[in-house]
């Protein structure tokens, strides 16, 4: 058994003291979006500091809790606060919670982020459904020995965000008269914001919005066979 699986089992042992349920949906709440946890019927919550091998979020707006509860009759586990490359964590540390979620039964992962809008038709406050991404973080969580129990050595990333979930999200948005965009997210390391020349470059290579997260978690979720839906909240017009 690998050291990573040993670590996951140690984390699961703490979680199982609180709950033995199977959680089919995982949620990662991004910067400024932790308040969405109010829509979850909370049954249990565990501070990251109480979970073995979990990193600790250093971002002020991230609460640093793993939330267990229900939404719409579904058992969900939600991260109230995520980890970023610019905080000094490795890609493996950033994505460790996604590995744990898979062992809790998660088959569908909803990831959210706050981002800068570069597409000129996007406005502050718009929601963008992520249809693809560009990884400019300069690293990848799958580098190193592959764990065959998790997934293949060379996972297919031709559809990183599940088309069925995107269509479902569009339908829900239409029914609720919520305007949504669809586009490509590019991740950069940060923590500094981009220069004007960098914004022009990112637009030229096909990105609609820019942020500093989400892609590592998406790669690991795809590696483990999860369906992923990505939501970007445009907080600035770049």
Q: PLM features: what roles do these ranges have?
A:
Residues 107-108, 208, 227:
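Short acidic/polar active-site loop segments enriched in Thr and Asp
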Residues 102-105, 203, 222:
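Non-catalytic positions within long, well-ordered alpha-helices that form the structural scaffold/packing
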Residues 14, 18, 164, 168-179:
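Generic non-transmembrane alpha-helical segments
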Residues 171-208:
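Active-site/ligand-binding-proximal alpha/beta "capping" segment
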Residues 212-238:
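Zn-dependent metallopeptidase/amidohydrolase metal-coordination segment
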